[in-house]
Amino acid sequence: MLDTSQEIMKGTTTVGLIFDGGVVLATEMRATMGNMIASKRAKKIYQITPRIGLTTAGGVGDAQQLVRILQVECNLFEMRRGKTMSVGAASTLLSNYLNQNRYYPYYVQLLMGGFDDEGPSVYSVDAMGGATKEEDIVATGSGSPFAYGVLEDQYRAGMKEDDAKDLAVRAVRSAMRRDSASGEDIMVVVITKDKYEEHIESGLQRPSAARPTL
């Protein structure tokens, strides 16, 4: 019997990093089914609250259901408490839900980033419900080893917003060069105290200088 879980878990590249005043989340937009490109415009970053975003890697249906559950629970929390849920509380809620279903797991790997009273933060959450608060940078998916190479080398604490966005895009592009499951354009989300901003960057490389022929 073919075990497809490992294949499902790998096909993407998502990146999260903290800058001075906020968080940047970035993903490429290719969706794959085995060796086939199923979509070139796949959405992999979802807004959970006005200050929280979630990146998804893994099974599309599983990820979308979890997004809907989180959105509803966060809305109910705000209606009952009169305030928005913190990033840490939302990651704990997600972690608990995944752990309760560990024997029938959701095939996902998730990054949650946002801004609350404690400032910007990023959490990684696995299919078994394990949640980790990351210090500054994180990447998931099949392209993550390539993205980490760029992030580890070029990330600096206290980066400004524009520099952080540029680094996130370069990290995803680096993964796209070597990971066949990552490709197309790049979705970038910036979350600060005052905004949730989403835009698309080209996945294509800038033209390089002509190389001499042999």
UniProtKB/Swiss-Prot annotation:
Its main location: cytoplasm. It catalyses: Cleavage of peptide bonds with very broad specificity. Residues 1-11 form a propeptide. One of its GO terms (cellular component) is proteasome core complex, beta-subunit complex. The formation of the proteasomal ATPase PAN-20S proteasome complex, via the docking of the C-termini of PAN into the intersubunit pockets in the alpha-rings, triggers opening of the gate for substrate entry. Interconversion between the open-gate and close-gate conformations leads to a dynamic regulation of the 20S proteasome proteolysis activity. It holds the Pfam family Proteasome. The active site is at residue 12. GO terms for biological process: proteasomal protein catabolic process. GO terms for molecular function: threonine-type endopeptidase activity. HAMAP family: Proteasome_B_A (MF_02113_A). PANTHER family: ATP-DEPENDENT PROTEASE SUBUNIT HSLV (PTHR32194:SF0), METALLOPROTEASE TLDD (PTHR32194). Component of the proteasome core, a large protease complex with broad specificity involved in protein degradation. The 20S proteasome core is composed of 14 alpha and 14 beta subunits that assemble into four stacked heptameric rings, resulting in a barrel-shaped structure. The two inner rings, each composed of seven catalytic beta subunits, are sandwiched by two outer rings, each composed of seven alpha subunits. The catalytic chamber with the active sites is on the inside of the barrel. Has a gated structure, the ends of the cylinder being occluded by the N-termini of the alpha-subunits. Is capped at one or both ends by the proteasome regulatory ATPase, PAN. Belongs to the peptidase T1B family. This is Proteasome subunit beta. It comes from Methanoculleus marisnigri (strain ATCC 35101 / DSM 1498 / JR1).
